Amino acid sequence: MMILKMKKEDLPAFLESAKQWGELWGPTTKEEQTAYSKVDGLSQMDLKATRTMIPPKKFLYPPRFTMFDFDEEGFVERTGDVPKRILFGLHPCDIHGILIMDKLFLETYKDPYYAERREKTLLLGHSCIPDDKCMCFATNTDFVAEGFDLFFTDLKMFYLVWVGSSRGHDLVRMRADLFSRNLDKNDILNYTEYRKWKTAQFKAKIDLTGMPDIFELGYNSPVWDELAEKCLSCGQCSMVCPTCNCYNVVDEVELGTVEGTRDRFWDSCMFREYSVVAGGHNFRDKRADRLRLWYTHKLQAFIGEFGKPACVGCGRCVSTCPVDINVATVSKALKEQEVGK
């Protein structure tokens, strides 16, 4: 992988040139809430924001979209109408989240809708500063070595830029005059110090070692019922999680016609209706069962299948849950067999 150097003052010019490839999107903050928005340039972005409300998976796996239109003659797929986008400012944890989504939607059974959006999206990562909700140090997702086209590490006076794909190389070639391959001893020392400094910024103390065994041992623990007493089953944790991928499919038909659309939309195993089957039986009618399923999948089952948790430590569940149920509090409760008050 090639690593280049770029002066910070040259970033606006680079992004202006990159817009030849597609729409430019970046993190913007309004009324203390940060979201990805279409922007004209760097001046509209908030690169100091720790996290966006909704992860960037929404660009690859939209909250709702039409798969195809149908009538009595047949159906026509909705393809080719996805715009080309450049997402700038993605943090390491969110890129790790997209890598997990890639594994689920592009391997074994390739999802054509996800694949089209992934192909038409460039991922330009940016370094970040952890806050008291960040847990990526515990999930080993505080740095990233793949999954991006370019990654910009802010070393105060300049950027170190990792080129992660051929498309990233294409962007660099558009303004090759802004980049340098001449890295020296000081650049190495600065980057080493940056890594030490970032690691020291983590305030959330969370230890996820041994979680698969702890979940197995605690499968019938009363802790789940205690947590369920607090849980609202609102599903916010699923909506903001970078790796949640459950969906439902519904046909929308115009009254009095046989014309309609087949739509896919986000769903959540935290919803009571999620596990209802024909005849009205519900496999997970109890809130405790749904809560246990969600966390068992994140911190046990996914590790068993893929060797790493399906939590990337972004802290969105911490900042979103109104009753303080999140990866940190649940793992702590299981280890101590006591729900924090």
Regions found by a protein language model. Give the residues of each.
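Oxyanion-binding "anion nests"
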Residues: I206-I214, C231-P242
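Iron-sulfur-associated redox domains of electron-transfer enzymes in respiratory
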Residues: M1-I214
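Histidine- and/or cysteine-centered catalytic micro-motif in compact active-site loops
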Residues: S166, Q236, P242-V249, Y274
